[in-house]
């Protein structure tokens, strides 16, 4: 069970005005308290939607068997009704009946490494510096931009986001700074110091696998300027010219149980414990990377994506990370930059809103040179490495190397059109892209598959995500019709429009809390909590097929010309993320090399062809002008 690619369909914030210095106390709480609570959908409604979603992905025999199980489950006075009542009681007692369960199930109890399997990476536009000065100047400006965004969070002046005219829960913005995941033997935890009595005033900077604590506020509480931060980054760079022989950070890339053991080992030592505490408490991390290995232009972006997602291995930049840290910004010597974030705290949109703000901020000219004041030397974080820890580091290096070699990742910039074309056809760009994904997959494999697209539940207090299931009866009818020469072109157009509209309708239901995936998960977890034997519908082949997402997808729109990416959630699947810009679309496609049936470049090729064929179909049969 993976971080379920929980990434969402939300309008980006746009550039926020430089933050007001006036603190608006209580505004955040008042806004949050006014949000509706997440409803528990009616049982029969969810089960009907479940049966409908199974039709394109399971055989007729399997479907008929599941229909029987569903009927038994929802008999009057039966187990389904009992579990539903339990969920409804839970919903009355809690601020959000799902959020705590979801955090545990999707993230904290997930035992695979966070690297590749859970934490998304982001590629930002390549910067035009090519030397150390440029790298440090840009990093300093980026840090100043994040602190500017942070002041809006601190002062509660962050503009509220809206979706379909409804205000959204802003809680995730309060989770992404000064927070960190902590490994545990069976379940991890997340620590957050933003609201502590003495909130942290430092960030972590990593260079040559060495960690530094850099104070970014003066004693009077004002933030350092980018000029002042630049001077501090130079000091860090000059005091870490050689790579650390023991890249402690690489331990965070391991399987969670393995890392939990190594972590307990590591923090037995007081010096190590203090260093780890400093990293966990820091506002965020900045990784000053070596340049990405030189490769031809067409694969350069794929290499950069790897650097952002996993660091490229122990010979490159993987030791320059603390993967448990919620936010890590990465700036390399050659101008490539981006970030990786730990997924437990938030979905993509709050991260992208921060990125949009920061990238816009980095373009602002320095109007005044700030006065040079004497600043203390940034503190180097020391680690005492025992033979046992050294051995743990070696094992982590080997495991990471295997994971990296298995990842097949491809960046695609689709130049032919952007969201402008579907909009001109009065079609939702997101739904249009999702139907193209269905067409691409069907053309390769000759069948539909369980497809996950993340839907935001942020209309509700503490809402995270639910699932939009893109493989539908209507999408299957379209992709079959598209390959059938006996189907008239005009009918193909109608099938396409119907498939896009069906996806749009599912999306609208999902963001209103009426999708069935989280509801079924809730019923399953309620059964575990009530210690009743697991109902048959959850032990059924159809349920296993429905939860095996061969396509795990997400739209993460941004104003910045960037794209997010993540690994597939199943061994024989794809991870696909996209940012539809006005006249082009940024895609990322990932697969695993260990699966002979999947190939990221092939999927990207078929996706491009599907989008072009759908455009041609619509252009050849224009809608009648009303």
Swiss-Prot record:
**Any single Pfam family the record assigns to this protein:** Carn_acyltransf
Q: Where on this chain does CoA bind?
A: 419, 423-430, 456, 504, 555
Judging by the UniProt lineage, the source's domain of life is Eukaryota
The consequence of residue 565 to A is: Increases activity towards short-chain fatty acids
Which keywords fit this entry according to its UniProt record?
Acetylation, Acyltransferase, Endoplasmic reticulum, Fatty acid metabolism, Lipid metabolism, Membrane, Mitochondrion, Mitochondrion inner membrane, Peroxisome, Transferase, Transport
Q: Which residues form the active site?
A: 343
Q: Which residues are modified to N6-succinyllysine?
A: 93, 261
Q: Which family does it belong to?
A: Belongs to the carnitine/choline acetyltransferase family.
**Catalytic reaction list:** (R)-carnitine + acetyl-CoA = O-acetyl-(R)-carnitine + CoA; propanoyl-CoA + (R)-carnitine = O-propanoyl-(R)-carnitine + CoA; butanoyl-CoA + (R)-carnitine = O-butanoyl-(R)-carnitine + CoA; hexanoyl-CoA + (R)-carnitine = O-hexanoyl-(R)-carnitine + CoA
**Ranges spanned by the short sequence motif Microbody targeting signal, renumbered to the chain:** 624-626
Residues bearing PTM N6-acetyllysine: 261, 268
User: Its function?
Assistant: Catalyzes the reversible transfer of acyl groups from carnitine to coenzyme A (CoA) and regulates the acyl-CoA/CoA ratio. Also plays a crucial role in the transport of fatty acids for beta-oxidation. Responsible for the synthesis of short- and branched-chain acylcarnitines. Active towards some branched-chain amino acid oxidation pathway (BCAAO) intermediates. Trans-2-enoyl-CoAs and 2-methylacyl-CoAs are poor substrates.
The outcome of changing residue 564 to G is:
Lowers activity towards short-chain fatty acids. Strong increase in activity towards medium chain fatty acids
Membrane topology classification: Peripheral membrane protein
Quaternary structure (record): Monomer.
Task: Give compartment(s).
Answer: Endoplasmic reticulum; Peroxisome; Mitochondrion inner membrane
Under what name is this protein listed?
A: Carnitine O-acetyltransferase
Q: Cellular component terms, GO, for this chain's entry? A: endoplasmic reticulum; mitochondrial inner membrane; mitochondrion; peroxisome
Enzyme class at the top of the EC tree: transferase
Q: Which residues bind (R)-carnitine?
A: 452, 454, 465
Extract the GO molecular function terms from the UniProt entry: acyl-CoA oxidase activity; carnitine O-acetyltransferase activity; carnitine O-octanoyltransferase activity
């Amino acid at each position: 069970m993976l971080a379920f690619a929980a990434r969402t369909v939300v309008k980006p914030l746009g550039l926020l005005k430089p933050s007001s210095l006036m603190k608006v106390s209580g505004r955040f709480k008042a806004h949050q308290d006014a949000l509706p609570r997440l409803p528990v959908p009616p049982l029969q409604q969810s089960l009907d939607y479940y049966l409908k979603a199974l039709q394109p992905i399971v055989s007729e025999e399997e479907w008929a068997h599941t229909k029987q199980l569903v009927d038994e489950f929802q008999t009057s006075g039966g187990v389904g009704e009992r579990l539903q009542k339990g969920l409804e009681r839970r919903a009355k007692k809690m601020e959000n009946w799902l959020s705590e369960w979801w955090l545990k199930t999707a993230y904290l109890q997930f035992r695979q490494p966070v690297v590749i399997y859970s934490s998304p990476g982001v590629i930002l536009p390549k910067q035009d510096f090519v030397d150390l000065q440029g790298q440090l100047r840009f990093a300093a400006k980026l840090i100043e931009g994040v602190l500017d965004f942070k002041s809006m969070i601190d002062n509660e002046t962050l503009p509220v986001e809206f979706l379909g005219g409804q205000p959204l829960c802003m809680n995730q913005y309060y989770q992404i700074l000064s927070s960190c995941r902590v490994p545990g033997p069976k379940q991890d935890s997340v620590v957050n110091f933003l609201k502590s009595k003495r909130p942290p005033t430092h960030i972590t900077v990593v260079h040559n696998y060495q960690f530094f604590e850099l104070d970014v506020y003066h004693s009077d509480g004002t933030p350092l300027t980018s000029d002042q931060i630049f001077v501090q980054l130079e000091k860090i760079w000059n005091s870490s010219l050689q790579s650390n022989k023991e890249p402690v950070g690489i331990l965070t890339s391991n399987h969670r149980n393995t890392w939990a053991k190594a972590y307990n080992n590591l923090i037995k030592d007081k010096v190590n414990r203090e260093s780890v505490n400093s990293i966990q408490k820091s506002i965020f991390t900045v990784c000053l990377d070596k340049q990405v290995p030189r490769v031809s232009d067409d694969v350069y972006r794929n290499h950069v994506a790897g650097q952002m997602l996993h660091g490229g291995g122990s010979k490159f930049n993987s030791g320059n990370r603390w993967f448990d840290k919620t936010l890590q910004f990465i700036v390399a010597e050659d101008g490539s930059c981006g970030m990786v974030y730990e997924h437990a705290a938030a979905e993509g949109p709050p991260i992208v809103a921060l990125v949009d703000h920061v990238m816009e901020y980095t373009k602002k000219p320095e109007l005044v040179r700030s006065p040079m004041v004497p600043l203390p030397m940034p503190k180097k974080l020391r680690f005492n490495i025992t033979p046992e820890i050294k051995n743990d580091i070696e094992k982590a290096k080997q495991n990471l190397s295997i994971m990296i070699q298995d990842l097949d990742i491809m960046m695609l910039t689709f130049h032919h059109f952007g969201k402008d074309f579907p909009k001109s056809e009065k079609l939702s760009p997101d739904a249009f892209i999702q139907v193209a994904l269905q067409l691409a997959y069907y053309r390769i494999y000759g069948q539909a598959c369980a497809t996950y697209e993340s839907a935001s539940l942020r209309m509700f207090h503490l809402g995270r995500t639910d699932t939009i299931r893109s493989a539908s009866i209507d999408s299957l009818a379209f992709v079959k019709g598209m390959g059938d020469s006996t189907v008239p072109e005009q009918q193909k157009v109608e099938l396409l429009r119907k498939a896009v509209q069906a996806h749009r309708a599912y999306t609208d239901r999902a963001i209103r809390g009426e999708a069935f995936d989280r509801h079924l998960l809730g019923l399953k977890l309620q059964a575990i909590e009530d210690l009743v034997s697991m109902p048959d519908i959850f032990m059924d082949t159809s349920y296993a097929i429905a939860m095996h997402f061969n396509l795990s997808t997400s739209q993460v729109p941004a104003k910045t010309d960037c794209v997010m990416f993540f690994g597939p959630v199943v061994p024989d699947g794809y991870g696909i993320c996209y940012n539809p810009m006005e006249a082009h679309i940024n895609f990322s496609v990932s697969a695993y090399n260990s699966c002979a049936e999947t190939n990221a470049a092939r999927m990207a090729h078929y996706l491009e062809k599907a989008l072009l064929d759908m455009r041609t179909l619509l252009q050849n049969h224009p809608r009648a002008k009303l």
